[in-house]
Protein backbone atom coordinates (compact mmCIF):
# COMPACT_ATOMS: atom_id res chain seq x y z
CA UNK A 1 0.00 0.00 0.00
CA UNK A 2 1.85 3.03 -1.34
CA UNK A 3 0.64 6.61 -0.94
CA UNK A 4 2.08 10.08 -1.44
CA UNK A 5 5.37 10.70 0.45
CA UNK A 6 6.15 6.95 0.69
CA UNK A 7 9.86 6.19 0.23
CA UNK A 8 10.56 3.14 -1.97
CA UNK A 9 13.72 1.23 -2.87
CA UNK A 10 14.55 0.98 -6.57
CA UNK A 11 14.72 -2.59 -7.90
CA UNK A 12 16.63 -1.89 -11.12
CA UNK A 13 20.03 -0.62 -12.29
CA UNK A 14 18.84 2.77 -13.55
CA UNK A 15 21.10 4.54 -11.05
CA UNK A 16 18.49 5.56 -8.49
CA UNK A 17 18.67 4.07 -5.00
CA UNK A 18 15.58 5.49 -3.30
CA UNK A 19 12.55 7.31 -4.67
CA UNK A 20 9.55 9.04 -3.12
CA UNK A 21 6.01 8.65 -4.41
CA UNK A 22 4.63 12.06 -5.37
CA UNK A 23 1.40 10.90 -7.04
CA UNK A 24 -0.66 7.74 -7.41
CA UNK A 25 -1.84 7.65 -11.03
CA UNK A 26 -5.30 6.50 -12.05
CA UNK A 27 -7.97 8.98 -11.02
CA UNK A 28 -8.09 12.20 -9.03
CA UNK A 29 -9.33 10.61 -5.79
CA UNK A 30 -7.02 7.56 -5.91
CA UNK A 31 -5.11 7.36 -2.62
CA UNK A 32 -3.22 4.04 -2.55
CA UNK A 33 -1.14 2.01 -5.00
CA UNK A 34 -0.40 -1.70 -4.75
CA UNK A 35 1.71 -4.17 -6.76
CA UNK A 36 1.40 -3.51 -10.50
CA UNK A 37 0.15 0.07 -10.16
CA UNK A 38 1.89 3.01 -11.81
CA UNK A 39 3.00 5.93 -9.64
CA UNK A 40 4.89 9.19 -10.20
CA UNK A 41 8.16 9.30 -8.25
CA UNK A 42 10.96 11.76 -7.47
CA UNK A 43 14.53 10.45 -7.14
CA UNK A 44 15.80 11.09 -3.59
CA UNK A 45 19.11 9.19 -3.68
CA UNK A 46 21.15 8.19 -6.74
CA UNK A 47 24.52 6.64 -7.53
CA UNK A 48 27.13 9.16 -8.75
CA UNK A 49 27.43 8.16 -12.42
CA UNK A 50 24.01 6.61 -12.97
CA UNK A 51 21.44 7.25 -15.66
CA UNK A 52 19.23 9.32 -13.36
CA UNK A 53 19.96 12.26 -11.07
CA UNK A 54 18.58 13.32 -7.70
CA UNK A 55 15.46 15.42 -8.21
CA UNK A 56 14.42 13.80 -11.49
CA UNK A 57 10.74 12.83 -11.82
CA UNK A 58 9.75 9.53 -13.45
CA UNK A 59 6.90 7.08 -13.72
CA UNK A 60 7.43 3.83 -11.81
CA UNK A 61 5.62 0.54 -11.31
CA UNK A 62 5.34 -0.92 -7.81
CA UNK A 63 6.89 -4.43 -7.76
CA UNK A 64 7.03 -5.22 -3.99
CA UNK A 65 5.06 -3.98 -0.98
CA UNK A 66 5.39 -4.69 2.73
CA UNK A 67 1.58 -4.71 2.94
CA UNK A 68 1.51 -7.65 0.54
CA UNK A 69 -0.85 -8.81 -2.17
CA UNK A 70 -3.75 -11.22 -1.65
CA UNK A 71 -4.18 -14.02 -4.18
CA UNK A 72 -7.56 -15.48 -5.18
CA UNK A 73 -6.62 -18.77 -3.43
CA UNK A 74 -6.18 -16.88 -0.13
CA UNK A 75 -2.38 -16.72 -0.08
CA UNK A 76 -0.80 -13.44 1.03
CA UNK A 77 2.58 -12.52 -0.49
CA UNK A 78 4.47 -9.99 1.69
CA UNK A 79 7.94 -8.49 1.31
CA UNK A 80 10.41 -6.83 3.67
CA UNK A 81 10.39 -3.55 1.75
CA UNK A 82 8.53 -1.44 -0.76
CA UNK A 83 10.21 -1.40 -4.17
CA UNK A 84 9.56 0.06 -7.61
CA UNK A 85 11.04 -0.10 -11.11
CA UNK A 86 11.53 3.21 -12.95
CA UNK A 87 9.80 3.63 -16.31
CA UNK A 88 10.23 6.04 -19.21
CA UNK A 89 7.38 7.97 -20.86
CA UNK A 90 6.47 4.91 -22.97
CA UNK A 91 6.18 2.87 -19.72
CA UNK A 92 9.24 0.76 -20.59
CA UNK A 93 11.82 0.00 -17.85
CA UNK A 94 14.77 2.42 -17.66
CA UNK A 95 17.18 -0.19 -16.31
CA UNK A 96 18.43 -3.34 -17.98
CA UNK A 97 18.42 -5.52 -14.84
CA UNK A 98 15.88 -6.15 -12.07
CA UNK A 99 17.00 -7.00 -8.53
CA UNK A 100 15.00 -9.20 -6.18
CA UNK A 101 11.77 -11.12 -6.67
CA UNK A 102 8.60 -9.76 -8.28
CA UNK A 103 5.05 -11.07 -8.02
CA UNK A 104 2.99 -12.86 -10.64
CA UNK A 105 0.53 -9.95 -10.63
CA UNK A 106 2.93 -8.10 -12.97
CA UNK A 107 2.36 -10.69 -15.72
CA UNK A 108 0.25 -8.35 -17.82
CA UNK A 109 1.06 -7.41 -21.40
CA UNK A 110 2.40 -4.05 -20.22
CA UNK A 111 5.02 -5.36 -17.78
CA UNK A 112 6.20 -8.63 -19.38
CA UNK A 113 9.66 -7.09 -19.89
CA UNK A 114 10.03 -6.61 -16.10
CA UNK A 115 8.87 -10.18 -15.41
CA UNK A 116 11.33 -11.59 -17.94
CA UNK A 117 14.25 -9.63 -16.44
CA UNK A 118 13.43 -10.56 -12.83
CA UNK A 119 15.52 -13.32 -11.22
CA UNK A 120 12.47 -14.79 -9.45
CA UNK A 121 8.71 -14.54 -9.94
CA UNK A 122 6.58 -15.45 -6.92
From Swiss-Prot:
Family annotation (Pfam families): Ribosomal_L14 (PF00238)
Claim: rRNA-binding is one of the keywords in the record: yes
Gene3D superfamilies cross-referenced by the UniProt entry: Ribosomal protein L14
Superkingdom of source: Bacteria
SUPFAM superfamilies: Ribosomal protein L14 (SSF50193)
InterPro entries from the UniProt entry: Ribosomal_uL14, Ribosomal_uL14_bac-type, Ribosomal_uL14_CS, Ribosomal_uL14_sf
One annotated GO biological process: translation
SMART domains assigned: Ribosomal_L14
Statement: the UniProt record of this protein carries the keyword Acetylation: no
GO MF assignments: large ribosomal subunit rRNA binding; structural constituent of ribosome
A GO-annotated cellular component: cytosolic large ribosomal subunit
UniProt keyword annotations, A-Z: Ribonucleoprotein, Ribosomal protein, RNA-binding, rRNA-binding
Record's subunit section: Part of the 50S ribosomal subunit. Forms a cluster with proteins L3 and L19. In the 70S ribosome, L14 and L19 interact and together make contacts with the 16S rRNA in bridges B5 and B8.
Family statement: Belongs to the universal ribosomal protein uL14 family.
Protein task: Binds to 23S rRNA. Forms part of two intersubunit bridges in the 70S ribosome.
Matches recorded under PANTHER family: 50S/60S RIBOSOMAL PROTEIN L14/L23, LARGE RIBOSOMAL SUBUNIT PROTEIN UL14M
This protein's name: Large ribosomal subunit protein uL14
Amino acid sequence: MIQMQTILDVADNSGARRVMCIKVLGGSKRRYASVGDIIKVAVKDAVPRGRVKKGDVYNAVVVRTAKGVRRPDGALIKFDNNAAVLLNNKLEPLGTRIFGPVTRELRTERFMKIVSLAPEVL
